[in-house]
UniProtKB/Swiss-Prot annotation:
Identification of the protein by name: Large ribosomal subunit protein uL22
Tagged with keyword Ribosomal protein: yes
Stored PANTHER family: CHLOROPLAST 50S RIBOSOMAL PROTEIN L22-RELATED, LARGE RIBOSOMAL SUBUNIT PROTEIN UL22M
Subunit structure: Part of the 50S ribosomal subunit.
Molecular function as annotated in GO: rRNA binding; structural constituent of ribosome
InterPro entries: Ribosomal_uL22 (IPR001063), Ribosomal_uL22_bac/chlpt-type (IPR005727), Ribosomal_uL22_bac/org-type (IPR047867), Ribosomal_uL22_CS (IPR018260), Ribosomal_uL22_sf (IPR036394)
Amino acid sequence: METIAKHRYANSSAQKLRLVINLIRGKEVSKALEILTYTNKKAANLVKKVLESAIANAEHNDGADVDDLKIAKIFVDVGPSIKRIMPRAKGRVDHILKRTSHITVVVSDR
């Protein structure tokens, strides 16, 4: 049985998140949680929360055994960018893009 968890509009760029999700793709959830715990990146914390949510969803909604779960799919899509300006010298401005992402984790007991 496949179970999905999503975090939409995560405050991190897709490029930074993809560095982390590539470490855990296809692994067992216990091993993936261990890897994320010791990965020293902000994105690792975001991905860990979504993975824990997917595990809880599988356990509560589908009655799955946590020890049998593996990461079936994990991907990051680009979300909308929030546009900000930063004033500079001589009346100019720099444009700042605050990037967001959508994290999707699918766990399966097969």
